[in-house]
A protein has these predicted regions:
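A broadly conserved amphipathic alpha-helix scaffold signal in soluble, globular proteins
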Residues: 100-103, 120-124
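Short glycine-/acidic-enriched loop or helix-start segments at secondary-structure transitions
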Residues: 16-17, 73, 121-123, 144
Length: 145
C-alpha cells in the first residue's frame, strides 16, 4: 500500500475571489474573511479525494490536523492517519514540520494544496529527498507548481 502525505495550506487562495492579491499576513487574511472569502485549498483537497473514488481505499494517507488536511478527509469520507501538529490557527512553520515528519517516516510522496509560499516551505523542509506534487491553490501562482 502506498503511503501518501497530504498537506493543505488552509488560507491559500482565499484572497483571489474577493479581489485581493493573496492572504499573506494576518491583516490581509482578516480583510479577506470580512469580504466573504472561502477556503479554496480545502475545497480543492476535498475534490481531489472524492475524485480518487475507490482508489483512495488503496492508499494510506497521512495528513495534518484540522484545516491542514484532516477536515478534507472528514468531508470526503476518506480514512487517514492524522500526524502530530497544531490544531486551530497555523503558520508556515507548521507546514515545514509536517513535511519533515512525513520525510522522516519514509512516505512515498507528499501532495500539497497551496501557493508559492507553501511550495517554498515544503521544498525548504524536504529538499529533493521525496517526490512532491503540488495542487495549485494560491492566488498569484508564480512558481512552477
Amino acid at each position: 500500500m502506498r503511503r501518501v502525505g497530504f498537506i493543505v495550506n488552509p488560507i491559500a487562495g482565499m484572497g483571489g475571489a474577493v479581489g485581493l492579491k493573496g492572504t499573506d499576513g494576518d491583516e490581509i487574511l482578516e480583510r479577506a474573511v470580512k469580504l466573504g472569502a472561502e477556503r479554496v485549498s480545502l475545497r480543492r483537497a476535498e475534490e481531489f479525494l472524492r475524485a480518487l473514488g475507490v482508489v483512495a481505499q488503496t492508499i494510506e494517507f497521512w495528513t495534518c490536523p484540522d484545516g491542514m488536511g484532516e477536515e478534507a478527509f472528514l468531508r470526503a469520507g476518506v480514512r487517514c492517519t492524522v500526524i502530530p501538529g497544531r490544531r486551530g490557527k497555523t503558520c508556515a512553520e507548521d507546514t515545514k514540520q509536517a513535511a519533515r515528519y512525513m520525510l522522516e517516516h519514509n512516505l512515498d510522496i507528499i501532495v500539497f494544496f497551496g501557493g508559492d509560499g507553501t511550495a517554498r516551505d515544503i521544498l525548504d523542509s524536504v529538499d529533493m529527498k521525496i517526490p512532491v506534487l503540488g495542487v495549485p491553490s494560491g492566488v498569484k501562482m508564480q512558481s512552477g507548481v
